[in-house]
Swiss-Prot record:
The modification N6,N6,N6-trimethyllysine is found at K5. This is Ribulose bisphosphate carboxylase large chain. Its main location: plastid. The lineage of its organism: Eukaryota, Viridiplantae, Streptophyta, Embryophyta, Tracheophyta. It is found in: Plastid, Chloroplast. It catalyses: 2 (2R)-3-phosphoglycerate + 2 H(+) = D-ribulose 1,5-bisphosphate + CO2 + H2O; D-ribulose 1,5-bisphosphate + O2 = 2-phosphoglycolate + (2R)-3-phosphoglycerate + 2 H(+).
Length: 455
C-alpha cells in the first residue's frame, strides 16, 4: 500500500517500550501519573512520553521525513505507587538531541511544557530528572560554588549566618541601610533583601544599593570580617536586571540576588553568567516554588527545580528548614540538599532520589535554611545541614527584645557554641538545648533570646 496509515492510534504502540535499554546520554524523567478512570497506565505513560517529545494526536505525513526511532521519548518502565490507588511512576527516556545545549528553559519547555493539561491524565507530577553528563557539560552552573565562596569570604568550618531585613516593605533606604549595619556589626555574615523588594516608590533600587554598601563597609571595618548583603537585582526586564548587577559590581559588593522562578530561567542564566564574569556571588530565592511543588500529585517536585537551578546557576538557594516538620520531610529535604552540594549522588528512593546523578565537577550550591527559625533550633540546624549551608534568621534576629545587633550576637554565639560542641564530639541532637543554655550563661544577648523564644 502506498503512503502512510492515517488516523488516530494508541500512543502505547509507539511510545511504550519496556525493553528499551536507557543510554548514558538520555535525559531520564520520573513522572507520577494519575490516569483518568479507564485509561491503562501504559497508555498514560506513553502519552506523556509522546506529547513531551515527537508525538501529536494523529499520524502525520511528515513523520515519514524523519526518524521517529531516533527522536522519540520512550516510556520504558511503569510501577504502581504503594498505598495510592491508580497512581503510577512512569519512567521516560528522552534522546539528548531533543534539547538545546545550555538552556534550562528549553529543557523544561520540552519535558513539562504541554503534557500537564493532557485529557487522559487526571494529574501529573514530575518527581525527578536524571541529567546526563553530556548535557550537564553544556551548562556553566553556579557562578562560583561552595569552595570559591569560602575562599572569597575567608570563612571556614561553620555554616554562614544571614538575616532578611524586615519589615520587608516600607522602610526608606537610609533606615534600611541602618538595619543592615546593625545586623552585620553584631556578627552575621550576610543580610538579605526580601524577595519582593525590587524598586518601589518608597525605596528605589539605586538608593538601597548605595546605603547597603555603606553599611557593609562600615561593619566590615569594625569587625575585621568580610560581610555581604544580597542586593536583589530582580527586575521587569533582563536589561534592567543587568543594569542593577553592574551597579552592584561598581560598588564593589560581594553578592547579588535573584528570584529565579518569577524572573525565569533565561533571566537567571543570563545573570549567572554575568556574575561569574564579574566576580559576584549569586543568591537565589525560590519565590513561587509552592505554586509548582506543593501539590503531592500534580506539578513538579522541588528537587527538580533545585537541579535546574544548579544547571542555570546560583551560589545559594533557599531549600526549607527541616526543623519542626515531619520526619519524612527531613530525609526528602536532605536528599535534594545533597543534590545541590555533592558531586555524585546515588539513587535512593527513601530520600526521594529516583536516579543516580553525576554532576561531573559542576560547582555546588549552598542550601539556605530560612523561615521561622531561632536560637533554639541552632543545634538541630547545625547537625542537619552541616558546615556547607547558610542559616537565615529574619525574625529570629530582628525580633530580639534589645534590637538587631544583640539579636545578631545571640545567633552568632549560639552557632559558635554548637560548632565547638560538635567539634568536641558532643551529640547535638540530644544535648542541643543544654549546649545553648551553657552558652547563654556568658552571653546576655543569647540569654535574652532564649527567654523570648522558649524551646
Amino acid at each position: 500500500s502506498v503512503g502512510f496509515k492515517a488516523g488516530v492510534k494508541d500512543y502505547k504502540l509507539t511510545y511504550y517500550t519496556p525493553d528499551y535499554k536507557t543510554k548514558d546520554t538520555d535525559i531520564l524523567a520520573a513522572f507520577r501519573v494519575t490516569p483518568q478512570p479507564g485509561v491503562p497506565p501504559e497508555e498514560a505513560g506513553a502519552a506523556v512520553a509522546a506529547e513531551s517529545s515527537t508525538g501529536t494526536w494523529t499520524t502525520v505525513w511528515t513523520d515519514g521525513l524523519t526518524s521517529l526511532d531516533r527522536y522519540k521519548g520512550r516510556c520504558y518502565h511503569i510501577e504502581p505507587v504503594a498505598g495510592e490507588e491508580s497512581q503510577f511512576i512512569a519512567y521516560v527516556a528522552y534522546p539528548l538531541d531533543l534539547f538545546e545545549e545550555g538552556s534550562v528553559t528549553n529543557m523544561f519547555t520540552s519535558i513539562v511544557g504541554n503534557v500537564f493539561g493532557f485529557k487522559a491524565l487526571r494529574a501529573l507530577r514530575l518527581e525527578d530528572l536524571r541529567i546526563p553528563n553530556a548535557y550537564v557539560k553544556t551548562f556553566q552552573g553556579p557562578p562560583h560554588g561552595i569552595q570559591v565562596e569560602r575562599d572569597k569570604l575567608n570563612k571556614y568550618g561553620r555554616p554562614l549566618l544571614g538575616c532578611t531585613i524586615k519589615p520587608k516593605l516600607g522602610l526608606s533606604a537610609k533606615n534600611y541601610g541602618r538595619a543592615v549595619y546593625e545586623c552585620l556589626r553584631g556578627g552575621l555574615d550576610f543580610t538579605k533583601d526580601d524577595e519582593n523588594v525590587n524598586s518601589q516608590p518608597f525605596m528605589r533600587w539605586r538608593d538601597r544599593f548605595l546605603f547597603c554598601a555603606e553599611a557593609l563597609y562600615k561593619a566590615q571595618a569594625e569587625t575585621g570580617e568580610i560581610k555581604g548583603h544580597y542586593l536583589n537585582a530582580t527586575a521587569g526586564t533582563c536589561e534592567e536586571m543587568i543594569k542593577r548587577a553592574v551597579f552592584a559590581r561598581e560598588l564593589g559588593v560581594p553578592i547579588v540576588m535573584h528570584d529565579y522562578l518569577t524572573g525565569g530561567f533565561t533571566a537567571n542564566t543570563t545573570l549567572s553568567h554575568y556574575c561569574r564574569d564579574n566576580g559576584l556571588l549569586l543568591h537565589i530565592h525560590r519565590a513561587m516554588h509552592a505554586v509548582i511543588d506543593r501539590q503531592k500529585n500534580h506539578g513538579m517536585h522541588f528537587r527538580v527545580l533545585a537541579k535546574a537551578l544548579r544547571l542555570s546557576g546560583g551560589d545559594h538557594i533557599h531549600s526549607g528548614t527541616v526543623v519542626g516538620k515531619l520526619e519524612g520531610e527531613r530525609e526528602i529535604t536532605l536528599g535534594f540538599v545533597d543534590l545541590l552540594r555533592d558531586d555524585f549522588v546515588e539513587k535512593d528512593r527513601s530520600r526521594g532520589i529516583y536516579f543516580t546523578q553525576d554532576w561531573v565537577s559542576l560547582p555546588g550550591v549552598l542550601p539556605v535554611a530560612s523561615g521561622g527559625i531561632h536560637v533554639w533550633h541552632m543545634p538541630a540546624l547545625t547537625e542537619i545541614f552541616g558546615d556547607d549551608s547558610v542559616l537565615q534568621f529574619g525574625g529570629g534576629t530582628l525580633g530580639h527584645p534589645w534590637g538587631n545587633a544583640p539579636g545578631a550576637v545571640a545567633n552568632r554565639v549560639a552557632l559558635e557554641a554548637c560548632v565547638q560542641a560538635r567539634n568536641e564530639g558532643r551529640d547535638l541532637a540530644s544535648e542541643g538545648n543544654q549546649i545553648i543554655r551553657e552558652a547563654s550563661k556568658w552571653s546576655p544577648e543569647l540569654a535574652a533570646a532564649c527567654e523570648v523564644w522558649k524551646e
